[in-house]
């Protein structure tokens, strides 16, 4: 949230039998964190679920997007890619591979893609205006 600029809003908890009844957990309680990108009514909201499970989680090798099945990729559109890069570095993250890059020919050329990886190894694609470095290529 601090890297991209999300603001944490009031979250909620889901306990009791419900998480198991709908197939989310094996009975463990959920704590849902709600993040919002901007103050507008239509601003993007992201809900992250934290599970208080007694079982140890399995760490997977997510070197590339195709090395695991399931969701491992999230795209977020921002107004300032350079600010995201600064925030990422401040929190110990660096751009993944050789990103940011201008989109390939045939796609908008005034937009760049920054790839980050979250602490769980998921890919977080940041799309927004070109950075100064890319503008001056």
Regions found by a protein language model. Name each.
Residues 35, 46-48, 126:
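Hydrophobic beta-strand residues in large extracellular and virion-surface proteins
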Residues 126-133:
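Short beta->alpha transition motifs characteristic of CBS
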Residues 136-137:
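Flexible, disordered linker segments and immediate boundary regions flanking tandem C2H2 zinc-finger modules
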């Amino acid at each position: 949230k601090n890297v991209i600029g999300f603001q944490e809003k009031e979250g909620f908890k889901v306990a009791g039998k419900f998480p198991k009844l709908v197939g989310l957990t094996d009975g463990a309680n959920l704590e849902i964190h709600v993040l919002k990108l901007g103050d507008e009514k239509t601003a993007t909201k992201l809900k992250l679920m934290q599970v208080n499970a007694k079982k140890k989680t399995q760490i997977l090798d997510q070197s590339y997007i195709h090395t695991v099945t399931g969701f491992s990729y999230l795209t977020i559109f921002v107004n300032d890619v350079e600010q995201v890069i600064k925030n990422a570095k401040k929190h110990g993250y660096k751009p993944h591979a050789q990103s940011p890059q201008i989109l390939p020919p045939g796609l908008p050329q005034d937009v760049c893609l920054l790839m980050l990886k979250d602490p769980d190894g998921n890919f977080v694609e940041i799309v927004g205006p070109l950075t100064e470095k890319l503008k001056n290529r």
